[in-house]
C-alpha cells in the first residue's frame, strides 16, 4: 500500500474546510468521475463531522470558520484505476492556528510532526479573504532571499498586531516558517480557492501561476527565488462551484451539482475532480 500524507495550511477563511467537506460529499456519493475513489464498504473517518458542512454546501449555504480548538481529520483509503491504494489522512486545522504561528511563533509538537511527516503540503489561499495591504508593489531590485526577507519583515512588523484578514507579507512569513519546520525538500501545492471569482475577474484562460504572479508578487518572487529548496505548483479550486450570494450562480450549481466544481491544474487543464489535487502519480 502506498501511504500518502497531506497537510493543509492556510490563514482563516482560506477554504480548507470547504474543500474537505465537498471532497467528503463526492467520495461518499461515488457517482463522479474521479482519479481516486473509495470502495463502497469504506466510510471516511471523520465523515460525521464533515458531513454536516457538506450538507450546508449542497444547500448552497456558506460555512462558518473552524473553531480554534477543534481538531478534526479526514482519513480514508482511496484507490486509483490500477488498484493502487492511497491512505488519505488530512487534518483540518483552524486558520487561527497558523495566524498564531506567524504572530507568536507558537505551535504544538503534534502539528510539527504532521508537517514533517507529510508527503505534500496543500497551502490554501483565498484572495477574497485577504486584506488589501497584501497588494504591495515589488521593486525590481528585490530578487534575492535576503532582500525579500527584509521587505517582508518591514511590512509584517507594521501590520501583524491588527486583527484584520491576512495580507501577503503574512502569507510569505507563514510559508517560510513552515519551510523551516520541514526536514526535507517539501512538495507544496498552492491551492487558490474561490477560483470561480478569479475567472469572473481575470478571464477563464488565466493560469493559476499567472494569477499568483500578478496578484501576489511578493509570494511569487519568494517561491521563484527559493525554488531549489522546495517543489511548488499552483492550482485553482472552486470546491463549492460558485458564489452562494449570487442567485444565478446558485441556480447553476443546483442544476450542475458536482459538475459545478472547478479544479484547474498548473497546465490549465480543467475538471470537476477534487481528488486530482491529491493524486501524485
Where are these regions (language model features)?
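Switch II of P-loop NTPase G domains
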Residues: 65-122, 128-137
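Conserved GTP-binding G-domain of TRAFAC-class P-loop NTPases and closely related GTPase folds
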Residues: 112-114, 120-281
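Alpha-helix-centered segments that form part of catalytic cores
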Residues: 57-77, 159-175
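Short, well-ordered loop/turn elements at secondary-structure boundaries
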Residues: 2-3, 13, 84-85, 116-118, ...
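Short, charged/polar micro-motifs that form catalytic or ligand-binding hotspots
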Residues: 5-13, 84, 101-112, 161-168, ...
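Short, flexible helix-adjacent loops and helix caps
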Residues: 32, 102-103, 200
Amino acid at each position: 500500500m502506498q501511504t500518502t500524507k497531506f497537510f493543509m495550511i492556510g490563514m482563516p477563511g482560506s477554504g480548507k474546510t470547504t474543500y474537505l467537506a465537498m471532497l467528503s460529499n463526492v467520495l461518499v456519493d461515488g457517482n463522479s468521475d474521479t482519479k481516486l475513489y473509495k470502495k463502497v464498504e469504506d466510510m471516511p473517518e471523520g465523515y460525521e463531522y464533515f458531513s454536516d458542512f457538506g450538507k450546508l454546501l449542497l444547500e448552497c449555504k456558506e460555512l462558518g470558520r473552524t473553531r480554534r480548538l477543534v481538531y478534526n481529520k479526514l482519513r480514508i483509503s482511496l484507490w486509483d484505476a490500477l488498484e493502487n491504494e492511497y491512505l488519505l489522512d488530512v487534518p483540518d486545522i483552524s486558520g487561527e492556528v497558523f495566524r498564531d504561528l506567524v504572530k507568536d511563533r507558537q505551535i504544538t509538537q503534534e502539528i510539527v510532526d504532521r508537517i514533517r511527516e507529510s508527503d505534500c503540503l496543500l497551502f490554501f489561499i483565498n484572495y477574497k479573504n485577504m486584506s488589501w495591504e497584501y497588494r504591495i508593489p515589488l521593486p525590481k531590485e528585490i530578487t534575492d532571499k535576503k532582500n525579500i526577507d527584509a521587505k517582508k519583515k518591514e511590512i509584517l512588523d507594521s501590520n501583524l498586531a491588527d486583527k484584520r484578514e491576512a495580507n501577503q507579507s503574512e502569507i510569505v512569513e507563514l510559508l517560510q516558517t513552515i519551510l523551516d519546520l520541514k526536514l526535507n525538500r517539501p512538495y507544496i501545492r498552492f491551492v487558490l480557492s474561490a477560483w470561480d471569482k478569479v475567472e469572473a475577474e481575470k478571464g477563464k484562460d488565466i493560469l493559476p501561476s499567472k494569477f499568483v504572479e500578478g496578484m501576489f508578487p511578493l509570494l511569487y518572487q519568494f517561491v521563484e527565488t527559493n525554488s531549489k529548496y522546495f517543489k511548488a505548483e499552483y492550482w485553482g479550486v472552486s470546491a463549492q462551484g460558485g458564489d452562494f450570494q449570487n442567485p444565478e450562480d446558485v441556480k447553476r450549481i443546483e442544476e450542475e451539482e458536482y459538475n459545478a466544481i472547478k479544479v484547474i491544474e498548473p497546465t490549465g487543464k480543467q475538471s470537476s475532480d477534487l481528488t486530482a489535487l491529491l493524486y501524485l502519480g
